[in-house]
Amino acid sequence: MSKEKLLLGGAGGFGRMVAEQAMLQYDCVFVDDGQPVGAEICGIPVVGGLADLPELRKEYGLLVVGIGNNRFRAQVYEKAKALGYAFPNIIAPSAYISPYAKLGCGCVVLQNACVQNGASVGNGVLLNAGTEIHCDAAVGDYALIYTNSVVRTGATVGNFARIGSNCTICNHATVPDGTDIPDGSAVHSEVKQWTF
């Protein structure tokens, strides 16, 4: 039985990590403005750039964006949504998503990440390896959480927020929209908006 076709937006570092997981389930190709058509990245062909999404829609119906820049990732998804693409979630086999959690569309959940009972994760979210989203926590649209960070019970991570590696967002703490939390931080309450 043949695999469904999937466009992967972005062939950079994060895009390649997404591709490793996506290839397990889909027949993948890249779209990337920085690579020539016909190039192969990790054995996956590049079929065009982002400007080619309208033409590629004739052959591909599914797209996942593996670009770490939250705002740019959102722009690509919005453009693709207007063209009629659908956005599956890419979930590593070793990740765990509770059947009682809510996961938006176009999310990437890498190895050993965990989304627990009652947690909610928005659209276009990237959860790196070892990330934990505890019960009743909420992660907004187009957020990015790096390796081994924990969002504790009842905590909220806003839209477009970026959480560095090895961070703890403590119980019922709030990370506002667009905030950048540096590596190794612990957030105990609502933080002022740090941006990069």
Regions found by a protein language model. Give the residues of each.
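Small/polar loops that bind or transfer phosphate-bearing groups
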Residues: G10, V64-G68, C135, N171
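Phosphate-coordination loops involved in phosphoryl transfer and adenosine-cofactor binding
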Residues: K3, Y60, D136
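A generic structural signal for alpha->beta connector loops
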Residues: Q25-D27, G43, G84, N148, ...
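Phosphate-bearing ligand-interacting subdomains
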Residues: V37-Y96
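Hydrophobic, well-ordered beta-alpha structural blocks that scaffold small-molecule cofactor pockets
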Residues: M1-L56, F160
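Structural signal for interior beta-strand "rungs" in well-ordered beta-sheet cores
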Residues: N89-F196
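Short alpha-helical
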Residues: G13, R71-F72, K102
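Short amphipathic alpha-helical segments
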Residues: A19-Q21, C42, Q75-K79, V121, ...
